[in-house]
Amino acid sequence: MAEKRNIFLVGPMGAGKSTIGRYLAQQLHMEFLDSDTVIEERTGADISWVFDVEGEEGFRKREEAVINDLTLEQGIVLATGGGSVKSRENRNRLSARGIVVYLETTIEKQLARTNRDKKRPLLQTDNPREVLESLAGERNPLYEEIADYTVRTDDQSAKVVANQIVKMLEES
């Protein structure tokens, strides 16, 4: 991989996008960015607050603006929010402006990785499994639609997955 193309990580919450993204950026000597973190920095509030005050629609508008800005950067690894693919504009920008890696995982792994995380507004419910299954049905086809590569993250450490991605990129 001679030139440093942007790498965009997509996938459901709990797939490991942020953790894997940090390792990947380190290995490739690239900058790591997380769209949710940038939204929080720009609003001065956490994602839960944005959801509470502006609703999901307000959050998605902010997310769209952030993804537009960040995908114009050069040489970055970007961890996107799980729902970012709901926007056609986001899907188009991610596809056109870099390499999209879909981090795939099971509902069981998502539940295990997110069960104590209070910063996930969509999971603040009595039945998170039902929510995750519904989100998977809606979003998994969208991740697949834009993915240049797909990597399962279930039973591997973040470092191992990052190494796999580096290898895939070197071979292409």
Curated annotation (Swiss-Prot):
Its EC number is 2.7.1.71. Mg(2+) binds at S18. It is found in: Cytoplasm. Its main location: cytoplasm. The keyword ATP-binding applies. Substrate binds at D36, R60, G82, R139. One of its GO terms (biological process) is amino acid biosynthetic process. ATP binds at G14, A15, G16, K17, S18, T19, R120, Q156. The keyword Transcription does not apply. One of its GO terms (molecular function) is magnesium ion binding. GO terms for cellular component: cytosol. Pathway: Metabolic intermediate biosynthesis; chorismate biosynthesis; chorismate from D-erythrose 4-phosphate and phosphoenolpyruvate: step 5/7. Keywords: Amino-acid biosynthesis, Aromatic amino acid biosynthesis, ATP-binding, Cytoplasm, Kinase, Magnesium, Metal-binding, Nucleotide-binding, Transferase. InterPro entries: P-loop_NTPase, Shikimate/glucono_kinase, Shikimate_kinase/TSH1, Shikimate_kinase_CS. It catalyses: shikimate + ATP = 3-phosphoshikimate + ADP + H(+). Binds 1 Mg(2+) ion per subunit. Its cofactor is Mg(2+). It is an enzyme of class 2 (transferase). Belongs to the shikimate kinase family. Monomer. Catalyzes the specific phosphorylation of the 3-hydroxyl group of shikimic acid using ATP as a cosubstrate. This is Shikimate kinase. It comes from Vibrio vulnificus (strain YJ016).
